[in-house]
Design a protein with these regions (language model features):
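Bacterial lipoprotein signal-peptidase II cleavage site
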Residues: 8-21
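Ligand-binding clefts/hinges and TM-proximal coupling segments of bilobed small-molecule sensing domains
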Residues: 13, 26-27, 32-33, 171-187, ...
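Extracytoplasmic small-molecule ligand-binding "clamshell" domains
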Residues: 25-115
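Bilobed "Venus flytrap"/periplasmic-binding protein-like clamshell domains
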Residues: 45, 50-52, 70-87, 119-123, ...
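Extended ligand-binding regions for polar small-molecule ligands
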Residues: 79-81, 86, 163, 170, ...
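Acidic, polar ligand-binding/catalytic clefts
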Residues: 92-158
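A ligand-binding cleft/hinge motif common to bilobed small-molecule-binding domains
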Residues: 103, 119-128, 177-178, 200, ...
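Periplasmic-binding protein-like
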Residues: 137-144, 212, 219-259, 277-285
Length: 285
């Protein structure tokens, strides 16, 4: 996950990146009656509260703040329901529970069947929980102030003349060097907060960061800013996976469901809808 509380609380194709517990299962083992569930006949899904867009949508209701995971709207809500359908569950058979981000991948028993909450796979986390294969590969993105010249750019080539800000040692920095190749050296900062401040103060024309961070920057940190676009890459290797109790055989069945959603184009359609069109982060080429 990106290092900001708002988005966990990133777009590239969601190609299969295997994680701990990341094998697929036979059809018979994944029949609804054979699934290893917290409550028989019900799929219990965890996520944090508040539930923020574009990962979740719908209006704030009852126990849920900002958005409502039960709406089926927003990227992660839509993915969860698509997986549930492949496993044989109706929408009414899916129960959402509140699980604080940091406890979702902590060691020990789980009250959920899987948790979906912009959780990045890491080897350390995978030692104590199972991860599904990737359902989202984190892209890089570019943030600009509205009304500036760069805000009219629609291709990567059009970014070359501008002063780009970035945190040193990040995949964002590497992407600038390898792909954008600006005509002037990027402004490099020790922290992302410093790079954000430079954009806010007009010292740079744009900020390059991962997409989840870009959502946070535009929503909270830099007034009158927007995501100009995202870059067609998953090259950083960072990806989000659903989290399960360690050893839960349901992991393999969810991987099988994800494989089907990737193969029939459903996962890409969900991503295009909620992270490009609705969220206003078009892909720049």
């Amino acid at each position: 996950m990106a290092a900001v509380a708002f988005v966990a609380a990133g777009c590239g194709g969601s190609d299969d990146k295997s994680a701990a517990g990341g094998t697929t299962a036979s059809a018979s083992n994944c029949e609804k009656a054979n699934l290893n569930l917290v409550n028989s006949g019900q799929l219990t899904v965890g996520t944090d509260n508040p539930a923020f867009p574009p990962w979740f949508g719908g209006s704030e209701k009852a126990r849920w703040k900002v958005s409502d995971p039960r709406s089926g709207e927003g990227f992660e809500s839509a993915v969860a329901y698509a997986v549930a359908q492949k496993l044989g569950f109706t929408k009414n058979e899916v129960k959402w529970i509140v699980v604080p981000f940091n406890t979702s991948f902590a060691p020990g028993p789980k009250k959920f069947d899987f948790d979906i909450n912009e959780i990045s796979f890491t080897p350390a986390r995978a030692k104590v929980v199972n991860f599904s294969n990737s359902y989202y590969n984190v892209n890089q993105a570019i943030v600009v102030k509205k009304g500036t010249k760069i805000a009219n750019a629609k291709t990567i080539a059009e970014l070359k003349p501008y002063k780009l800000g970035v945190q040193i040692g990040t995949t964002s920095y590497q992407y600038i060097q390898d792909n954008i190749k600006p005509s002037q050296q990027p402004a490099v900062y020790d922290t992302n907060d410093a790079a954000v401040a430079a954009l806010k103060n007009g010292q740079t024309d744009a900020l390059v960061a991962d997409l989840p961070t870009a959502f946070y920057v535009t929503a909270v940190q830099v007034p009158n800013s927007k995501i100009l676009g995202q870059f067609p890459t998953g090259a950083s290797g960072e990806h989000f996976g659903m989290v399960f109790q360690k050893g839960n055989s349901l992991t393999a069945c969810v991987n099988t469901a994800l494989d089907k959603l990737k193969a029939d184009g459903t996962l890409q359609q969900i991503q295009d809808k909620w992270l490009s069109k609705v969220a206003g982060a078009p892909v720049l080429k």
